[in-house]
Amino acid sequence: MAKKSKIAKLHHQEALVKKYAEKRKELKAKGDYIGLSKLPRNSSAVRLHNRDRYDGRPHAYMRKFGMSRIKFRELAHKGQIPGVRKASW
């Protein structure tokens, strides 16, 4: 599990991205790069790093499910992910 501070930082960053998304879009459309540079750096969506929504793990993230491979395997074995079955051929 990731440190609580890293998870809190991620939530804060996501809030900033959401807050400034519209303003950032307007400034980009106008081509006002000086105005863009005055916005907080963490308000850019590019700076977000995908993390497991359950335990905050930053590596081995599966975009389709929003979780790490470890949590995915754990929940899939319990049958808690709809539509996921163990492969057999």
From Swiss-Prot:
Any single Gene Ontology cellular-component annotation: small ribosomal subunit
Name of the molecule in the record: Small ribosomal subunit protein uS14A
Entry keyword Nuclease: no
Organism field: Limosilactobacillus reuteri (strain DSM 20016) (Lactobacillus reuteri)
One Pfam family here: Ribosomal_S14
Superkingdom field: Bacteria
Cross-referenced SUPFAM superfamilies: Glucocorticoid receptor-like (DNA-binding domain)
GO biological process: translation
GO MF annotations, alphabetized: rRNA binding; structural constituent of ribosome
Family designation: Belongs to the universal ribosomal protein uS14 family.
InterPro entries the record matches: Ribosomal_uS14, Ribosomal_uS14_bac/plastid, Ribosomal_uS14_sf
Role of this protein: Binds 16S rRNA, required for the assembly of 30S particles and may also be responsible for determining the conformation of the 16S rRNA at the A site.
Record's subunit section: Part of the 30S ribosomal subunit. Contacts proteins S3 and S10.
Entry keywords, A to Z: Ribonucleoprotein, Ribosomal protein, RNA-binding, rRNA-binding
